[in-house]
């Protein structure tokens, strides 16, 4: 796939999913959910204040009647109710509305709720469409794990692979990002990238092609790989997925590619029993729509 709009098309083929939206009462969220409904992706269930929802719908020219509204004015209670809906099978996909990410994640991680498996690994995966890259790019982790350890990185590779498979990439090329494409023994991200690449060579990480360490420019641009004389890499200049060494590098790339590079994104939480949409409260309606589509595509 080259465009996020293709994810919408693929998700539509799976039929409508029931979408539980926690504190879904802001204009961007309601516009995205309404668009997803019109695209044939979801049957929306909103947890929030009916009066506010109706007022925002009126201001945004949205047909409020298409929403099933569960009245609740408290944002934390909205999260808990929405989480319970997906856990009990009343909904298929969870989505964050106007509530803060911290409160949303606490609801997901609540052991009593049953959405997050014991000893599981929660992560964030995004699909990025950039004007200057010829295909969609799957990236992780940019929002959840501050400093993934080696074992967590192997799990993140599994998440990247799953999303890549969903968007039509049978054998994804995964780049383990580090400061340099040269192996630097004193830099942990560099040595771990090399170890992951060796595991991949031996088939320990599934049906993927993986290489590292690779600097960002070498991973994405063949010209950079040629100039730096990186030889023998099937990933350099043609990566499908980027595994970042920490949240700082991933988050900076994520925001720079969208806010400065003109990119669009779809994002979701991985590691839960059902797909969970996680976008920023300031993200556009289009970003939220694409994220809904990605989660619907991942839903059973």
Predicted regions and their residues:
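Anion-binding alpha/beta catalytic cores of soluble intermediary-metabolism enzymes, centered on
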Residues: 1-235, 240-300
